[in-house]
Structures are given as C-alpha cells and as structure tokens.
From Swiss-Prot:
Family under the similarity heading: Belongs to the SlyX family.
Source organism of the structure: Thiobacillus denitrificans (strain ATCC 25259 / T1)
Name listed for the protein in its UniProt record: Protein SlyX homolog
Annotated disulfide bonds: none
Gene, per the UniProt record: slyX
Domain of life of the native organism: Bacteria
Pfam families named among the record's database cross-references: SlyX (PF04102)
Coiled-coil regions listed: none
Amino acid sequence: MSDARITELETKLIFAEDLIETLNQTVIRQQAQLDQIQQQLRLLHRQLQDALAREAPAPGNEPPPHY
C-alpha cells in the first residue's frame, strides 16, 4: 500500500473518530434533556391528578341532574 493511500486512510479515520465523538456527545446531551423532560412530565401529571382529585365531587354528594 502506498504512503499516500495510508495517509488518506489515516485522515479518514481521524475524521470518522471525531464524528463519532461529536455524535456521542450529542446523544449524551439529548439523553439528559430527555430525562429532564420526563421528570417534568411526571411532575405535571402528578399535579394534574392532584388538581382533578380536589375538584371532583365526592360520590354521593353530586347534585341531582337538572332536566
């Protein structure tokens, strides 16, 4: 294999390794964002359930329907 071909392959390898590292860091950052969004969603869901429970009339205490 010629020196030029080896140099070309080494250059491509360096760029590929850099791209892989960049993509890996992007995935790590996006996973952290996803974890944060999921935590916020769980909190909002819990708050919604609490609010609905406070507003719902107790069974048997519902006003009669009006016709």
